[in-house]
């Protein structure tokens, strides 16, 4: 099968590797050359994916069997036409359109499906944001409707923060939508990602919950399994099943939840492998998240997903701008037991850009806090150089 991969970052790279292993053809697409997934693809294209005519051109050129989006900044409205042409959009044109924009997915979850979410409003200007803040109360969280990896996300604690939050959200927005969501701050005990695998002809499956920590709106560490009560887990699985069934199609979804004293709150959803799910590369499961996504897309039956080890991953961050980043200290990771790493191969670096991850695992009986601490220490051993 021929797969057109729209977005060629580190998640796309791991997906492309998984696809290569079972004989699939990958055409990797992004808006800059030598993106990570392009380095392991059969062919690549460099285009502005928000340009519908450019998308049409490469779809007509390559005639893919599948279109797999990896990022948000895509002219997803074109996907409906590609489905009419007989191309499978992953997980579906509807899912891709709804989840590329926080407004559509939040309204689906809260208004149509009745899932428990934080109180929220939308704003298209700093003045509207001020009204939204008054409606939901402070503290509150502001996010662009279209963004990734926490870009443009901030917390408003005082009235003086509103204009700054608006400007930061606009700067961090992807695509051409200048609108934000402002939501009441949920007093949560922890956050989890529930990797949810929707299959074409088989039941929906769930991975063991993944815990994660954010800083500057970006994921720093994730671990599996996360601690959660049976009651909260069943509630999260029920919500994840409802929202993925409403979106339709097959593939892996990363569904995020807040765990609170008041139960489980739906937060966000990504219709593709999730940043936090890279912990599955530590060998925590019988299939990692990229293999699960691929198998679901290709309608290869997945009998079950088993948790085999406890694991954690932590990011390797750049500290400076470079057009030719190099790495030191990798040998310090290589000599450690139960440990591994990935260098993404990004051609340039900038402060706080994720350049790789470290991975570690242990037995299911090992306290997860010990494994997370180990991963955090490992990440400090690798330096990104100019």
Swiss-Prot record:
Alphabetical keyword list: ATP-binding, Ligase, Magnesium, Metal-binding, Nucleotide-binding, Purine biosynthesis
What Gene Ontology molecular-function terms does this entry list?
Answer: ATP binding; magnesium ion binding; phosphoribosylglycinamide formyltransferase 2 activity; phosphoribosylglycinamide formyltransferase activity
Its annotated pathway reads: Purine metabolism; IMP biosynthesis via de novo pathway; N(2)-formyl-N(1)-(5-phospho-D-ribosyl)glycinamide from N(1)-(5-phospho-D-ribosyl)glycinamide (formate route): step 1/1
**Annotated Mg(2+) binding sites:** 256, 268
Q: Which residues bind ATP?
A: 102, 143, 148-153, 183-186, 191
Q: Does the keyword Metal-binding apply?
A: yes
Q: Which reaction does it catalyse?
A: N(1)-(5-phospho-beta-D-ribosyl)glycinamide + formate + ATP = N(2)-formyl-N(1)-(5-phospho-beta-D-ribosyl)glycinamide + ADP + phosphate + H(+)
Where do the ATP-grasp domain residues begin and end?
107-298
Tell me the SUPFAM superfamilies matching this sequence. Answer: Glutathione synthetase ATP-binding domain-like, PreATP-grasp domain, Rudiment single hybrid motif
Q: Where does N(1)-(5-phospho-beta-D-ribosyl)glycinamide bind?
A: 10-11, 70, 275, 346, 353-354
User: Which GO cellular component does the record give, naming just one?
Assistant: cytosol
Q: HAMAP family, per this entry?
A: PurT (MF_01643)
Q: Which PANTHER family match?
A: FORMATE-DEPENDENT PHOSPHORIBOSYLGLYCINAMIDE FORMYLTRANSFERASE
Could you tell me what this protein is called?
Formate-dependent phosphoribosylglycinamide formyltransferase
In its UniProt entry, the species of origin is given as Flavobacterium psychrophilum (strain ATCC 49511 / DSM 21280 / CIP 103535 / JIP02/86)
Q: Which gene encodes it?
A: purT
């Amino acid at each position: 099968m021929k797969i057109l991969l729209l977005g060629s970052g580190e998640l796309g790279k791991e997906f492309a590797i998984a696809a290569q292993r079972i004989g699939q053809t990958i055409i990797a697409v992004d808006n800059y050359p030598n993106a990570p997934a392009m380095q392991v693809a059969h062919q690549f294209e460099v285009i502005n994916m928000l340009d519908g005519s450019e998308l049409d051109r490469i779809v007509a050129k390559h005639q893919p069997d599948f279109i797999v989006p990896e990022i948000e900044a895509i002219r997803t409205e074109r996907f409906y036409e590609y489905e009419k042409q007989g191309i499978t959009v992953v997980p579906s044109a509807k899912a891709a359109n709804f989840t590329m924009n926080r407004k559509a997915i939040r309204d689906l979850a809260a208004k149509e499906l009745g899932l428990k979410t934080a109180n929220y409003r939308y704003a298209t200007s700093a003045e509207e944001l001020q009204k939204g803040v008054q409606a939901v109360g402070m503290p509150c969280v502001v996010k662009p409707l279209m963004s990734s990896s926490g870009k443009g996300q901030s917390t408003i604690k005082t009235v003086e923060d509103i204009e700054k939050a608006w400007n930061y959200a606009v700067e961090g927005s992807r695509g051409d939508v200048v609108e934000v969501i402002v939501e009441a701050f949920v007093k949560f005990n922890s956050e989890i990602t529930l990797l949810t695998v929707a299959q074409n002809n088989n039941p929906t499956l769930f991975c063991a919950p993944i815990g994660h920590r954010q800083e500057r709106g970006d994921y720093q560490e994730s671990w599996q399994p996360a601690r959660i009560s049976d009651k909260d887990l069943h509630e999260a699985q029920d919500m994840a099943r409802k929202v993925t069934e409403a979106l339709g199609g097959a593939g892996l979804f990363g569904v995020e939840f807040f765990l609170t004293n008041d139960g489980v709150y739906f937060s966000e959803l990504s219709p593709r492998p999730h940043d936090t799910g890279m912990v599955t590369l530590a060998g925590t499961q019988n299939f990692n998240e990229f293999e699960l996504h691929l198998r679901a897309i290709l309608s290869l039956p997945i009998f079950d997903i088993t948790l085999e080890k406890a694991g954690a991953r932590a990011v390797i961050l750049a500290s400076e701008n470079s057009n030719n980043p190099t790495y030191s200290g990798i040998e310090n990771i290589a000599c450690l037991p139960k440990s591994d790493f990935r260098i993404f191969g990004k051609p340039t670096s900038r402060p706080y850009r994720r350049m790789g991850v470290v991975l570690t695992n242990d037995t299911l009986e090992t306290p997860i806090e010990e494994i997370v601490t180990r991963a955090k220490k490992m990440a400090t051993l690798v330096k990104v150089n100019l």
